[in-house]
Curated annotation (Swiss-Prot):
GO cellular component: cytosolic large ribosomal subunit
Gene that this sequence comes from: rplF
Keyword Cytoplasm recorded: no
Source species: Mycoplasma genitalium (strain ATCC 33530 / DSM 19775 / NCTC 10195 / G37)
Pfam families membership: Ribosomal_L6
Gene3D superfamilies cross-referenced by the UniProt entry: Ribosomal protein L6, alpha-beta domain (3.90.930.12)
Gene Ontology molecular function: rRNA binding; structural constituent of ribosome
Protein name as catalogued: Large ribosomal subunit protein uL6
Its biological purpose: This protein binds to the 23S rRNA, and is important in its secondary structure. It is located near the subunit interface in the base of the L7/L12 stalk, and near the tRNA binding site of the peptidyltransferase center.
Self-association and partners: Part of the 50S ribosomal subunit.
């Protein structure tokens, strides 16, 4: 049996509702609605009992065990997303590194000769504080992480000076540069 698949997911029935069709699982909550696509002939059942959701499997095939844990994690992330939401913070470290939001675009100045414009997905909200702190929030964990990674890829942190786009509380292991010793 799958350890992750056997975990029960706690919900507040007054806030969260679950609807299942043959191809979609829809979870509604106070922050919005998350849908999970289900493969055809999925041998799993999603049962709501009191204040928990249980994902149960019908057989002991290897593929079913794999899907059991995966879909339990996906449903758990969807429930957390529609109740609390997800958030990632990025920090710009470097001389002249700035960010601002203009309409649907996030403008970044990261030391290149041109500003970088990233289109903000509809399901996300992006806030910029102090021109160097970017907060990305939304109800889909995957989308929040993906957009944060897209921003970070423009200037990954480098180990010598520590400049770049960092996740909040990320520790960059610094390297010592070459030192010029006296010539003999």
């Amino acid at each position: 049996m799958s350890k992750i698949g056997n975990r029960s997911i706690k919900i507040d029935p007054s806030k969260v509702s679950l609807m299942q069709t043959t191809t979609l699982l829809t979870i509604k909550g106070p922050l919005g609605e998350n849908t999970i696509k289900l493969p055809k002939n999925l041998p799993l059942k999603f049962v709501v009992e009191n204040d928990t959701i249980k994902v149960t499997n019908n057989n002991n095939l290897k593929q079913t065990k794999i899907l059991h844990g995966t879909f339990n994690a996906l449903v758990n992330n969807a429930v957390i997303g529609v109740t609390k939401g997800f958030e990632k913070k990025l920090i710009l470290v470097g001389v002249g590194y700035r960010a601002n939001v203009e309409g649907q675009f996030l403008n970044l100045q990261l030391g290149y000769s041109h500003p970088i414009k990233e289109l903000i997905p509809n399901q996300l909200t992006v806030k910029v504080e102090k021109n160097t702190e970017i907060t990305i929030s939304g109800i889909k964990k995957e989308l929040v992480g993906q957009f944060a990674t897209e921003i970070r890829k423009w200037r990954k942190p480098e180990p010598y000076k520590g400049k770049g786009v960092l996740y909040f509380n990320e520790v960059i292991v610094r390297k010592q540069g070459k030192t010029a010793e006296g010539k003999k």
